[in-house]
UniProtKB/Swiss-Prot annotation:
Biased composition (Polar residues): 174-190, 201-214, 441-478, 486-496
Source organism superkingdom: Eukaryota
Gene, per the UniProt record: PUX11
CDD domains linked: UAS, UBX
Biased amino acid composition, Basic and acidic residues: 290-301
Keyword Acetylation: yes
PROSITE patterns according to UniProt: UBX
Biased composition (Low complexity): 160-173
Protein name as catalogued: Plant UBX domain-containing protein 11
């Protein structure tokens, strides 16, 4: 355990994850228990120098005890069936390798190196092809190589084909019987041997290559650099149309395709002869990327259909019509329908007995008149969902009480209308009995311009009006009925001790004007009497 503790990361799980991402290393999780195989791993495998060297170069190791909270959380994301369990997680969070049970030190070191190299080759190839495809203005012609669909959670084939000594595992986590391809090597005679192995355990994601020596790290890195420099030339060659003068390429492509299909179905070992032209995983990636573009076209067509549905919906207008009693009518009309159709719908569906009315928009307030009935809803700017209110038309009302006296005076003497209005304004400053309307129609003296201060001539006219207003044709009842108009005129004179039982111009009724001067109240009813 002392050797294992020296290899593990000193820190929390989040810190270990950030460390692995920052240094581009594999995040390796070792879950152990109290069983015999876990103890054997601790004594024999983790103490080996090759394992320690591989971990220091390629991995960040975290040790978790089985049954702990961290082990439960890990199993929820990356399920495992037994302990001890060793799992390698890539940069993007995908599980690239896992083994359960005892494993030798040589196999563990080789598997970790191959997983790290395959992950880096995949990342380098993907970045180069992404840059190459982004620079293309036109769509790249699709080669005759068929696209190979990889199961979820597996390593792409470019990690196995691009590197001669790289082993890749292809196995879905859900199937009972899976096939893993391992130890894909290129012999001197140009033969590609693809060895398939059928595993009885669904959790075994790695086929250890015991017979194959572990490749050197320096040689593999040089191979990666060579593949990176060779990639732009391949991209340019793939842009050119395929000519029938290279039958070896087509034969090789069909052979690889048939071998992959047969390997999945039967799990048998197939040895095929290569004509000297190898098909790398980059061809498969290119085909997959082009297929992705083609699969996106139906989505665009679906988007156009959705736009057509939206435009179809925009051609309908949903109206919510509010009636005066608080009820509502809801109906859908076309934008080409005229407003008269809406009004006919209201007439046929209302039950409150509406009279003459108009339709209006509540905000901003706009009332549609009879001239708008022949206009379409689109011309009236009614789209989508709109609210309308029913506005009843107001009936004209005649108030006879307020107009009977003045109209009779105007009809009696049409020339006295302006004079009466002017005198009435002047009397509002000095006369508390300004409700006498046209009582000055028989006055013959002309009135000068408006005066802001009362004068003796106006006061004399007041006395004459008070004594001469006895014409039975105009009626005394109208004089008494117009008493409330005094407050409506707004005079600034306050009367004192007014009694309606007395004569309107009786003696002893004193009043004040706006200049604190008291008039009236004398024995003879003289309005010129000042106090």
């Amino acid at each position: 355990m002392e050797a294992l503790s020296s290899l593990t990361f000193k820190g929390s799980l989040p810190e270990a994850i950030f460390e692995a991402k920052g240094k581009k290393k594999l995040f390796v999780v070792y879950i152990s228990g109290e069983d015999e195989e876990s103890d054997k791993l601790n004594r024999l495998t983790w103490t080996d120098a090759s394992v320690a060297d591989s971990l220091s170069k390629y991995c960040i190791l975290v040790h978790i005890q089985a049954g702990s909270v961290d082990a439960t959380n890990f199993s929820a994301i990356y399920p495992y069936s037994s302990v001890p369990c060793i799992a390698a997680i890539g940069f993007s969070g995908t599980q690239v390798w896992r083994t359960e049970g005892f494993i030798t030190a040589e196999d563990l070191a080789s598997s970790l190196e191959k997983a790290w190299l395959g992950l880096h080759i995949q990342e380098t190839t993907a970045s180069i092809f992404s840059a190459a495809l982004a620079s293309q203005n036109s769509e790249t012609p699709v080669s005759s190589a068929s696209s190979v669909v990889l199961p979820p959670g597996s390593v792409p084939l470019d990690a196995a084909v691009a590197s001669p000594s790289t082993a890749s595992s292809v196995q879905p986590s859900e199937t009972k019987s899976t096939v893993t391809s391992a130890s894909t090597t290129e012999n001197n005679d140009g033969t590609v041997a693809v060895k398939g192995k059928e595993s009885a355990e669904p959790s075994n994601l790695c086929d250890t290559t015991k017979n194959q020596p572990a490749p050197s790290v320096d040689g593999t890195k040089a191979n990666v650099e060579h593949e990176a420099t060779e990639t732009p030339l391949r991209v340019q060659a793939e842009k050119e149309p395929i000519r029938p003068t290279a039958p070896g390429t087509n034969d090789n492509t069909s052979r690889v395709r048939s071998s992959v299909d047969r390997k999945r179905k039967q799990g048998t070992v197939i040895n095929e002869e290569d004509s000297g032209v190898g098909v790398s995983g980059r061809d498969i990636n290119l085909t997959k990327s082009v297929d992705t573009k083609e699969t996106m076209k139906p989505k665009d067509e679906g988007g156009e259909e959705e736009d057509g549905e939206k435009s179809k919906k925009a051609s309908d207008v949903h109206l919510n019509i509010r009636l005066p009693d608080g009820s509502s009518l809801q109906e859908k009309f076309s934008v080409t329908s005229i407003l008269r159709m809406v009004k006919d719908y209201v007439n046929s569906n209302q039950t409150i007995g509406l009279g003459a009315y108009d339709l209006a928009v509540p905000y901003p307030r706009k009332v549609y008149t009879d001239q708008d009935l022949d206009k379409s809803l689109s011309e009236l700017r009614l789209f989508d969902r709109q609210a309308l209110v029913v506005v009843p038309r107001k009936r004209a009302t005649v108030y006879q009480r307020g107009t009977s006296y003045s109209e009779s005076n105007n009809n009696t003497d049409p020339n006295s209308g302006g004079y009466f209005a002017y005198v009435r304004r002047v009397l509002s400053y000095a006369n508390p009995f300004s409700y006498f309307g046209g009582g000055t129609a028989n006055a013959s003296s002309s009135v000068p311009e408006r005066q802001t201060r009362p004068n003796t001539e106006v006061r004399n006219n007041l006395g004459q009006v008070g004594t001469s207003f006895q014409d039975p044709s105009e009626g005394r009842s109208n004089v008494r009925n117009r008493r409330p108009t005094t407050s409506r005129i707004g005079s600034n004179i306050h009367t004192l001790n007014h009694n309606e039982d007395e004569a309107p111009f009786g003696d002893g009724n004193a009043f004040w004007n706006g200049n604190s001067t008291q008039y009236g109240g004398g024995s003879g009813g003289d309005s010129n009497d000042r106090r």
